[in-house]
């Protein structure tokens, strides 16, 4: 069992009770989280735009210890975008090696999950805690967004506020 499996095959939530479930497009990879996200944000950086083929990335941030995989550990693919290498060197991107769906960004302590992968019912009822609190790297935006959320040129509170 490698380091990733040791970390995510178990979780440090006392009496782990799944609160939310996420899965890739094909369903081969599934994971649970036992808490609400600590934050959620929209990233407009060029790297996120290119990796997701979209103008932005919406991420809900969890402590890694609150994440537990229930299927598909053997179908995970890792990519370190800073080094441009398909390896699990943190921080890295995590995707399904079958359908190619992006699952999360894995940091050293945090798991940045993509809320659109979670099962919020049909029609979806996204919990308030998953809704974004700000935009980061808004200076690289493809188009303006008038949503009244704070907008930062780079990272939150350590770059210029743009709106």
Annotated model-derived regions:
Residues 1-21, 28-163:
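A short Gly-Trp-Pro
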């Amino acid at each position: 069992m490698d380091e990733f499996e040791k970390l995510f095959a178990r979780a440090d939530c006392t009496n782990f009770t799944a609160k939310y479930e996420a899965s890739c497009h094909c369903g081969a990879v599934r994971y649970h989280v036992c808490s609400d996200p600590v934050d959620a944000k929209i990233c407009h950086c060029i790297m996120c735009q290119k990796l997701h083929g979209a103008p932005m990335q919406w991420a809900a941030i969890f402590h890694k210890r609150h994440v537990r995989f229930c299927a598909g550990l053997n179908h995970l693919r890792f990519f370190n975008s800073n080094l441009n290498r398909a390896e699990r060197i943190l921080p890295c991107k995590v995707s399904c090696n079958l359908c190619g769906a992006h699952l999360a960004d894995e940091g050293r302590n945090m798991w940045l999950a993509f809320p659109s992968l979670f099962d919020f019912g049909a029609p979806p009822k996204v919990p308030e805690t998953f809704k974004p609190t700000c935009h980061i790297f808004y200076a690289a935006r493809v188009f303006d967004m008038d949503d009244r959320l704070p907008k930062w040129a780079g990272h939150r509170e350590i770059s210029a506020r743009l709106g």
